[in-house]
């Protein structure tokens, strides 16, 4: 190799790195990567060869991960996130509407000129004008859209992996799709988010906290409806057997179709309308969309099977006999419902009260993707608020009724309108939000998400349409956060009515009810089945107990039916819990009517349930806090708020001078006593490089021990991660300052007003 070439190599490497960085970066002008689809480069076919299938998403081997470092040899197709943000903001949409009309008008003109075979010069002039109008629209979008939505996802994922926030589980064995391990930073971040969640909800609302079993017997989930209804629609490649979740497949195909060069405005509008309403379509309607647009396998171009239902629960066997079937819980809520009676007793029979639970749940996703967004094992933080079904007021609603939320109602979704900012008090008064308790939790959810660092302009509450409502809900709002993947459902807030407690009462015969005292005693008629135990035992032997238990569970309507049948043909057919039927006559049972005076009334409580997906919240927060230094795109960091930052403070001796060690050790001990997580970085690297390393793991503050620290009075510098500014603080004061900053009792702006800004050391040794 020549000397000239050897000298040129460093410059070539730098140039190559710069080009790769530029390619990987995504800005509004280059269309932000809301969804990333990978496709191998295709070669131009020979004239005799059949045309290739449209570009599709190739199958990724299970051994690969989705991290940015694996993407260097793939062609990345980018889709803009601007549209999704703008659609949620009516003020921005109003400003852009005239520009959109001008672009659409010019686009139609270009199509007409081409269709009529107009002179080439006329077409070129029209195209030039179209480009100018599109540029004007894009510039306006860029000016109006927050920078938080625009970022380099591949660069962020590289940083997350390199600093081990989280990584794919069992990576050395090839990894498992949809499963992730949290490293030291990810684990600390998750713990801090959950600690703040407990403070905001469990502590503030004086909730009862439980920790229930993950293994759930089948009868529990049969009663709740999960065995029958907890399924997604799936289609298969008829040749390879590859499985695809149907709604995701349709969305991907229609997005691609609407962005094709020959897509008409009518087709684009049709595709957008279907995508918006996709979650509300049933099996037959989704199959119709599949057939209408002739959607094929995205991996092979092969035909797909008819949609089939796939239950998302992980089945297992409890015990060695294999006779007890169970599931890994799909949600934590059922453990709370089956313990309702004990919890009500613990609360001295009083309503309302709320129960909190944090734990892992499991769903056997058909096609897990998008990192922490869609996984098979995930942490949930759920609340079950039990209240009187006819009195769903909340005592603290007055504290939050003026809170403004961005609400995307079901009506606005159906009419193609944007979300709107509404005071939660007005939303409840107008019945847009069903009741005060639901509205209270929605406002508290917003306060919590903003406190951990979610950007307010990227948060909205979307109401479920009636045909997409969960089987247990009578009203439901999802807190959705805008990320590079689009709007992601992170918190569900549902009014589950009395469904769950009613189902478990019917299945077990255990009355999961509450009581309330009546204003005045009242006389009521009572009907009950009176079994002739002697006759039952003689006739049915060992089955007599099952029959007696089944009779005790009959409702008032069923008792009336028993009486009618006994009066008719003298027989009543009873089905017991084991599925067997028994004919009972007047000699074995009778119906007794009586009256009694009651002072209390029984009722099945309603439940309002906020359910937090911690992994999704974490990922959204990491995106919103990811930044690169101005003028140095290689220096990336996370602006996580001190409240949730994994490590609150770093201690950085200026050099490895042994005189610094006593001060470093003293600071470390003081921070530990103050219960502040911290990291000592006394490595030999330059102080600037060490600052950059601590910024990468989101440490908000750094204490530097320098030569001025050795002088009386002993002082240190305190550095802020976001601004990189430093102040000079007394050695004995600095831990208290960091404590106040980390618990949000003070701000960095207040600290800079109280202490002098640090410019340079006075002493050098």
Swiss-Prot record:
Function: Catalyzes the ATP-dependent ligation of glycine to the 3'-end of its cognate tRNA, via the formation of an aminoacyl-adenylate intermediate (Gly-AMP). Also produces diadenosine tetraphosphate (Ap4A), a universal pleiotropic signaling molecule needed for cell regulation pathways, by direct condensation of 2 ATPs. Thereby, may play a special role in Ap4A homeostasis. Required for terminal arborization of both dendrites and axons during development.
Source taxon at top rank: Eukaryota
Reactions it catalyzes: 2 ATP + H(+) = P(1),P(4)-bis(5'-adenosyl) tetraphosphate + diphosphate; tRNA(Gly) + glycine + ATP = glycyl-tRNA(Gly) + AMP + diphosphate
Keyword Nucleotide-binding in record: yes
Protein name: Glycine--tRNA ligase
Keyword list, A-Z: Aminoacyl-tRNA synthetase, ATP-binding, Cell projection, Cytoplasm, Ligase, Mitochondrion, Nucleotide-binding, Protein biosynthesis, Transferase, Transit peptide
Ligand binding (ATP): 363-365, 374-375, 489-490, 616
Entry-linked SUPFAM superfamilies: Class II aaRS ABD-related, Class II aaRS and biotin synthetases, S15/NS1 RNA-binding domain
Subunit text: Homodimer.
Transit peptide: 1-87
Species of the source: Drosophila melanogaster
Gene Ontology cellular-component terms listed: axon; cytoplasm; mitochondrion
Binding site residues for glycine: 331, 382, 609-611
Region of interest: Disordered: 41-73
Family: Belongs to the class-II aminoacyl-tRNA synthetase family.
GO biological process, one term: mitochondrial glycyl-tRNA aminoacylation
Location of the WHEP-TRS domain: 95-151
Comp. bias regions, Pro residues: 47-58
